[in-house]
Design a protein with these regions (language model features):
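Long protein-protein interaction modules used by eukaryotic assembly/scaffold proteins
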Residues: 2-30, 34, 77-217
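Short, structured protein-protein interaction patches enriched in aromatics and acidic/basic residues
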Residues: 54-91
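N-terminal ordered "arm"
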Residues: 12-67
Length: 217
């Protein structure tokens, strides 16, 4: 089953391809596709503020580049009126300016608050393919046209494409309520790293995304 058909009940009707926002090495500067202004305005302001905070840390570049890709879910009223799922990856443009890269897609209004069964499998598959696409964009120095070709291949063309989804590790996933966001290191495992935030992560929570969680002790 293709990603498009398996997730048809999960994603908004117009969401055949994910939208994206940010920087990749194959692009000379910032770019975006298929994300509404209501999402982009909130997202850009959030990242600009957070990256400014990171730059106050002397060792931030090394730790930033080693940060994981995060899978996220946004409740309504976080980045516009709608709910979203996506992935966020530390990245850099073609001239060495650091800025994260995100793929996101709007959730259908009928999606239940707790994902189970086929709905959960569709979300896990979407996150896996979005992560794969982000890594191909980063490692392949892809420009916007070639990156969209990757999305077309993964999300539309390859009905038999495989992914690294480890189905069965988690039986359900509660989506965040309105005004909150959920951040997952690996959404396919039951006890993976996760963070729940009011709105988008700020201050110490933003640092945790890109510099790592503080060690307890």
């Amino acid at each position: 089953m293709s990603v498009e058909s398996s997730s048809s009940s999960l994603l908004a009707p117009a969401a055949a391809l994910p939208g994206w926002f940010g920087k990749l090495p194959g692009m000379g500067d910032f770019a975006h596709r298929r994300l509404p202004e209501a999402f982009r305005a909130v997202w850009d302001q959030w990242l600009q503020r957070g990256m400014s905070r990171l730059r106050d840390r002397a060792d931030w570049t090394e730790r930033y580049l080693e940060a994981p890709i995060w899978c996220f879910a946004l409740g309504r009223q976080v980045a516009g009126d709608q709910a979203w799922i996506g992935v966020l990856m530390p990245s850099v443009d073609g001239v060495g300016r650091y800025f994260p890269f995100a793929l996101a897609v709007e959730l259908d209004a009928s999606v239940p608050g707790c994902l189970q069964g086929k709905a959960l499998a569709a979300a896990l598959r979407w996150w896996a393919f979005a992560t794969q696409a982000a890594l191909e964009g980063l490692d392949g120095d892809l420009d916007a046209v070639r990156f969209d070709a990757v999305l077309q291949r993964l999300f539309v063309a390859d009905s038999g494409a495989s992914s690294d989804v480890r189905e069965g590790g988690v039986e359900s996933l509660d989506l965040p309520l309105a005004g909150t966001s959920l951040w997952l290191g690996d959404p396919s495992v039951e006890n993976g790293v996760r963070m729940l935030s009011t709105g988008l992560p700020r201050d110490e929570q933003f640092e945790a995304l890109f510099l790592g969680f503080a060690e307890e002790g």
